[in-house]
Regions:
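As written
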Residues: 71, 93-102, 106
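Non-catalytic signal-transmission and effector/linker regions of two-component phosphorelay proteins
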Residues: 1-15, 22, 42, 70, ...
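Conserved phosphotransfer microenvironments
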Residues: 56-72
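Hydrophobic/aromatic residues positioned on beta-strands within the core alpha/beta folds
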Residues: 83-85
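Acidic, metal-coordinating helix/loop segments flanking the phosphotransfer/catalytic sites
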Residues: 34-53
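Conserved phosphotransfer cores of two-component systems
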Residues: 46-49, 71-79
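Structural signature of beta-strand start/N-cap positions in the alpha/beta core
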Residues: 7, 31, 50-52, 80
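Two-component/phosphorelay signaling modules centered on CheY-like receiver
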Residues: 15-33
Length: 121
């Protein structure tokens, strides 16, 4: 469990997946804000720009998800970004997300990868 509240923004258009993933992260002691689409995520980040981690579901947003990631990195270069994908996605070394996680790997792997990313901070 984190010693202090670690802030995470979870962006996912599937309300069921969003709710379950946010619940899992809250059970680990994280402070989780959610957004159902990229426009809402932009609004949340503008109002409260410091998140320890931003998680974006690329499966629902395709190209715009990667553009959103690049936008975050331009405004906040040290912001950690994890992308969730429905299958497997290969991105070059210079691409935006710090980590890509497949939804096929399951919820325990998702929490594990989030913890690993946050510990590396």
């Amino acid at each position: 469990m984190p010693r202090h509240k670690t802030r995470i923004l979870l962006v996912d258009g599937d309300s069921t997946v969003q709710h379950l993933r946010a619940l899992m992260l809250r059970m680990q002691g994280y402070d989780v804000d959610t957004a159902a689409d990229l426009e809402s995520a932009r609004t949340v980040i503008a109002a409260a720009p410091h998140y320890n981690l931003v998680i974006v579901d690329v499966g629902l947003f395709a190209g715009p998800g990667l553009e959103f990631c690049e936008e975050i990195k331009q405004r906040h270069p040290h912001q950690k970004v994890l992308m969730q994908v429905d299958g497997h996605l290969y991105l070059g070394r210079e691409s935006c997300p710090d980590k890509v996680v497949s939804k096929q790997d399951g919820p325990q792997h998702f929490v594990y990868e989030v913890q690993r990313m946050l510990e590396a901070t």
